[in-house]
Structures are given as C-alpha cells and as structure tokens.
From Swiss-Prot:
Organism: Aspergillus fumigatus (strain ATCC MYA-4609 / CBS 101355 / FGSC A1100 / Af293) (Neosartorya fumigata)
Temperature dependency: Stable to heat treatment. Retains 33% of activity when heated to 100 degrees Celsius for 10 minutes at pH 7.5.
Principal location listed in the UniProt entry: secreted
Known role: Elastase inhibitor. Non-competitive inhibitor of A.fumigatus elastase with a Ki of 1.6 nM. Inhibits the fibrinogenase and collagenase activities of A.fumigatus elastase. Inhibitor of A.flavus elastase and human leukocyte elastase, and weakly inhibits porcine pancreatic elastase. Does not inhibit elastase from P.aeruginosa or C.atrox venom.
Protein name: Elastase inhibitor AFUEI
C-alpha cells in the first residue's frame, strides 16, 4: 500500500516534469492571436492546458532557467495580456 502511494506521487511529479513543449507553443500562439489586450483572469488560466504558467508583471524579477513547457504570459500594469512565449 505504501509503495503504491509512493508510485502515484512520483508519477504525478513526473507528469509535470514531462509536460509537452508543443502544447506550450500552441497555447502561446493562441494567446498572441486571441487574448492580447484582454485581462488575465482565473478563467484564462483555467482554459489553458500548459503547466506551468508564469504570469510576468511589470517590474517582476524572474529566474532565467529555460523550461520549454512553461508558458510565460506578460501583462501590463492593468493586468492586460501583452505577450506570451514559452521558456
């Protein structure tokens, strides 16, 4: 029983680590084509399948590690989407 639980937890972590970079690229294009100028809301976050998603606000300090499957959404001071890319 303990072994099964440990395996399930390990698989859950592995799924996040192996997220598909192609999904991120498709979603970045969708955001650029359909959501530029729209407010970033929970509904937007829930509609996107990329994992993880990082929202970048003006003046945010960010780490520079490259994660191909991570969707970065840049917003302005009014929380409106201005850009998206994978990294």
């Amino acid at each position: 029983m303990k072994f099964s639980l440990a395996c399930l937890l390990a698989l859950a972590g592995l799924q996040a680590a192996l997220a598909d970079p192609a999904t991120c690229e498709k979603e970045a294009q969708f955001v650029k084509q359909e959501l530029i100028g729209q407010p970033y809301t929970d509904a937007v976050a829930n509609a996107l399948q990329s994992n993880p998603i990082r929202v970048l606000h003006p003046g945010d300090m960010i780490t520079m590690e490259y994660i191909a499957s991570r969707l970065n959404i840049q917003v302005n001071e009014n929380n409106e989407i201005i850009s998206a890319h994978c990294a």
